[in-house]
Amino acid sequence: MIGCDCVVCRSPDPRDNRLRSSIYVQTPECSWVVDTGTDFRTQALRENIRTVDAVIFTHSHTDHIMGFDDLRRFSHVRGSMPVYASVETMHDLERVFQFAFKTLDPFPWYLKPEPHVIDGSFELGGTLITPLPVPHGDSIVNGYLFSRGGEKLVAYLSDCSAVPDEIAREISQVKALIIDALRDKPHPTHLSVKQALEVAARVKPEATYFTHISHELPQAAEARLQASARIGYDGLRLSF
C-alpha cells in the first residue's frame, strides 16, 4: 500500500509484497492470461512469460484491465490477440482502449484485439472454460471454471462478495479453488477470510488458495488456517 508502514507493508517476507491479481495458464496447446492489471508488464517480465495466445477478463475495474496495452508484444508476434469478456466488460474495454479497437489502424505495431463476447462455455486448446457469474458488490462479474477431459481442475473467483449455491454446485469438488479473501473484516465488495472458508466448505475442493489479498492479511496468517486453505502469493505455481 502506497505510504503505509503497517506490518505487512514493512514485512521482509517477499510473499507479503503483492501485485494485482491475475493468473497465467499454460497448457500443451496454448497459453492465456486472466486479467491484465496495472502490474501486468512487471509480472510478465518477472515470470519470463514469452507467449500469450489469448486474454480473458473477469470484469473491467481498473485493477484488472489497465495493463491491456502491454499485450501488444504478444499480439504483434501472433498477428492479433483474442479477447474474451462479457458484453459489459468488452464495451468498457472498447471505450477505454479506443485506439486498439479501431477498425482502421494505421499503426501495425498497435495491439490488435480480436473480440469474443462470452455467452457461455468456450474452449481454448483442449481446455473447456465455463463462466461463473458472481456478485461483486452491486456488480456481476465473471469467475471461471477450467476443465480438461471432463475433470474440473481450477475454479477462479478473484473478485466476489458472495458465491451463489448454483455456482458452488457447479464447481463442487474441483481440484483447486482460487478465491477472493481480502481480509479478516467484512467488506462490501469482497469476501472476508471467514466467508471464503465457508464457500470452500460448500465446494469441497482438494485445495483452496486465497487471492486478491489486502495488506490487512499477512502471509503469516496462513499458520492459523492449518490445512483448510493457503494464502496465495505472487509467483505461486500449480500443476495438474
Model-predicted segments: where are they?
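Catalytic metal-binding/acid-base residues of hydrolase active sites
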Residues: D39, H61, S161, L182, ...
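Binuclear metal-ion centers of metallo-dependent hydrolases, dominated by the metallo-beta-lactamase
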Residues: P164-F240
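A conditional alpha-helix N-cap/helix-loop micro-motif detector
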Residues: P14, G37, C160, P186-V193
